[in-house]
Amino acid sequence: MSIRPILASLALVLSLGLSAQQPDLNALDAYDADAVVKFDQPGLAVGIVKDGQLVWSKGYGKLDLAKADPVTPNSIFFIASISKAFTACAIGLLVDDGKLAWNDPVVKHMPWFRTPDPYVTEHMMVKDLLCHRSGWITFDGDLLWYGTDHDQRSILERHANEPFTHAFRDEFGYSNLMYIAAAQLIEAVSGKTWDAFVTERILQPLGMTRTTVETADLANFTDVALPHVRKGHDPAAPQKSMTFQALKGADGATGINS
């Protein structure tokens, strides 16, 4: 499995299409600048890739609304759940390595893994972890990792008895916890933590030198966009920048900055 076509989807990419005509970059520039205002965003970085080559890039807005530093094409953003694509890619690499198979039961590699239903526990496959169809409702269990210091196994074990809302593989339910389980699976099979495996097998081979899986590593970089929040989540309130939170318990589901 090639890494490059998978990770191409992670970039902020606008396709140039198949037409030989020169695109109107001035119109695109105006569109992007307007998007920052229209959607009330602190900043935005856009890149256009054609045939594997970066043909245009530009930054808009500010890294921090309280300061003047502008977003550039090289600005680092917290990419949140786009981190899941890296996790799926890492699982795919292990499949290619012959270390596991998509249809392997999760308990084959993680005997301690449990769900509230013994049948689901026995039949949950590797691919099920990535498909948001476990039976839990969207965001079920997220309060176990957000703002806590629980480690990943503890999070999964604490959540194991939470009743399913849907039948197994019957309904979509967006699950951060199943991607946390996927991160634990990567460690169980490879002997390396999720962050170490992603760094060694994906980031380094692709030369992604301005991508980090550790929030603490952002101290080594400049040109970093800060997250922003509205007071009381009031849509009419002004946005304020906030400090990055360490979300180690959610590795696999989130955590990458790029």
Please describe what each predicted stretch is:
Residues 64, 118-258:
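Short, surface-exposed loop or secondary-structure junction motifs
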Residues 8-17:
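Bacterial N-terminal signal peptides
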Residues 1-7:
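Bacterial N-terminal signal peptides that target proteins for export
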Residues 23-77, 99-101, 108, 151-153, ...:
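Short, conserved catalytic-motif segment at the N-terminal edge
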Residues 38-45, 66-129, 164-177, 251-254:
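Short active-site loop at a secondary-structure junction
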Residues 30, 88-89, 104, 180, ...:
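A generic alpha-helix surface/boundary motif
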